[in-house]
Amino acid sequence: MKNILIYLILFISIAGCNKKIEQENTAELKDKQIRLFWNWFVANEERFSKVTNNDKVLKEILNHASTIEGGLAFEVNSIKNGIKSLTISADGVKQLIPTVQKMVEKSPKIKSWKFIAFRQKKDKKLSTEIIYLSDQLKLEPSKMKFFPIVENDSLQLIIYSPGINKENYNEIFYGGSVLLDNLVGEYKFMTQVDNYDFHNMPTRKEDLNQLTPLFELSAFIDNYDAMKNKNRVD
């Protein structure tokens, strides 16, 4: 019996060590892939800066970044004076937050490029713009609303928009998720909102009266976070 117990302890210890080594090897491999990605980017950044079609640059970046971790998203934008920005996004996947942070932390210093972690909150003009997801499908933030559900320090949201149905739900969900990142800020949205979904706008007046305009979402989340922190201190 004593021998069996010793064997079990040894087995657990070895298994624990193996798991730790595996995690360290995975982290080292990811660091290496990030380093190789940025080395490749530096070697090509002058060419990227001259390309007017950002989609072409984006396609190359996505291809080379796929070795780091699946699920990452990228956005290339021209800012001004020949400077471009590369936004690295977790695309709503919380598990990818450390990878995004590490990639930007390890990014090179290049005068003509700005590297940004997560989609940033945009100005209030976004709430009045129309976002076209396709020729026949659009989102109008000014006509969208939300309903919060707060339970035990958990925030869930139902986002309402006109015209949502089974056929366009997936497209609405992805386009709407990017919109929420732009309205609130991707990092804040991911870390403060536990779950969310998109529903078709109700028609009954009593239901509509319970909803809040979508452009107020950022302020609501700020207040929710402040209240949650206050309760923890108390």
Where in this protein do the model-derived segments appear?
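Bacterial lipoprotein signal-peptidase II cleavage site
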Residues: 18-23
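Internal, hydrophobic cores of structured domains that mediate oligomerization or house catalytic pockets
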Residues: 92-194
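Glycine-rich, aromatic-bearing surface loops/beta-hairpins
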Residues: 165-234
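Sec-dependent signal peptide recognition
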Residues: 2-8
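Long, low-complexity, Ser/Thr/Gly/Pro-rich intrinsically disordered segments that act as flexible linkers
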Residues: 24-46, 73-80, 115, 119-124, ...
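An N-terminal, globular interaction/scaffold subdomain
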Residues: 60-105
